[in-house]
Design a protein with these regions (language model features):
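Bacterial N-terminal signal peptides
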Residues: 7-17
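Periplasmic c-type cytochrome electron-transfer domains
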Residues: 2-7, 20-259
Length: 259
């Protein structure tokens, strides 16, 4: 009798543990956890821009230079080497003498995995960019009122800023018009940082076609292209390429007990 009671007790405890485990299991990640599911045309445009050095002041660095796929979307360096550096990843060099970079970026390059998820509402190491419904743009940022309307997510808003930094992508004052505008704090408006970069993109027929395909309701001619459209596309590519939700654990959460 005692053994029977012990057996029944163990069964009850086991069932209770299973029920508890199932009730506390996290929900699987789904499309609803992300800001959007971009079109293939938007992702293709974002991919092209992500790897293109044309959106840097001196045309010598792209987003992918520091957020390299082969380095886990980072660069493997404790302090990143931005504009003016040579090489990729751990082989990236600051140069020397007159060819040396003006300064290293005082932080490492963050990854882009799952940053398109809605749970991320703050960007940058110091939180200087965040979602804020009280701001006209929808974001509290160092650009203040210069940040344009129409940015799809905080990740897209983040993509507006590396191009304004002298050590990241803009270059030093005196080297190019983009760097000069950044040095003077002219981010928005005619011949501001973002407009100067948009002018470059408008002058490339292949990009005009890609922008039209990605945003047919907003863009019909080259003159319609704004840098915020480029930022939205870059964020869409980062969101699609950096989405990591198909591990064996993710599969288990979706109901695959054999994962």
């Amino acid at each position: 009798m005692r053994l029977r009671r012990l057996y029944v007790g163990l069964v009850v405890c086991s069932l209770t543990a299973v029920v508890h485990a199932q009730s506390t299991r996290p929900f699987p990640i789904s499309d609803n956890d992300f800001y959007s599911t971009p079109s293939g045309a938007e992702v293709a445009l974002g991919r092209a821009l992500f790897f293109d050095k044309i959106i840097s002041g001196n045309g010598n660095i792209s987003c992918a230079t520091c957020h390299h796929p082969l380095a886990g979307t980072g660069d493997g360096l404790s302090l990143s080497i931005g504009e003016g550096g040579k090489g990729l990843g751990l082989a990236r060099d600051t140069g020397s003498g007159v060819d040396a970079v003006q300064g290293r970026i005082p932080r490492h390059t963050p990854h882009v995995f799952n940053l398109a998820a809605k749970e991320f509402s703050v960007m940058f190491h110091d939180g200087r960019l965040s979602v804020d419904d009280l701001e006209a743009s929808g974001f509290n940022s160092p650009a203040g009122d210069q940040l344009p309307l129409g940015l799809d997510s905080v990740l897209a808003a983040q993509a507006m800023f590396p191009v304004t930094s002298s050590t990241e992508m803009a270059g030093q004052a005196g080297e190019n018009p983009v760097a000069n505008a950044a040095f003077e704090g002219r981010l928005a408006g005619e011949n501001g940082v973002w407009d100067l970069l948009a002018q470059r993109l408008r002058a490339i027929p292949e990009y005009v076609v890609m922008f039209r395909d990605a945003y047919p309701e907003q863009i019909s001619t080259a003159d319609d292209i704004q840098f915020k459209d480029a930022a939205n596309a870059i964020a869409s590519f980062e969101g699609a390429a950096g989405r990591a939700d198909n591990s064996r654990f993710d599969q288990f959460l979706r109901g695959d007990s054999q994962a």
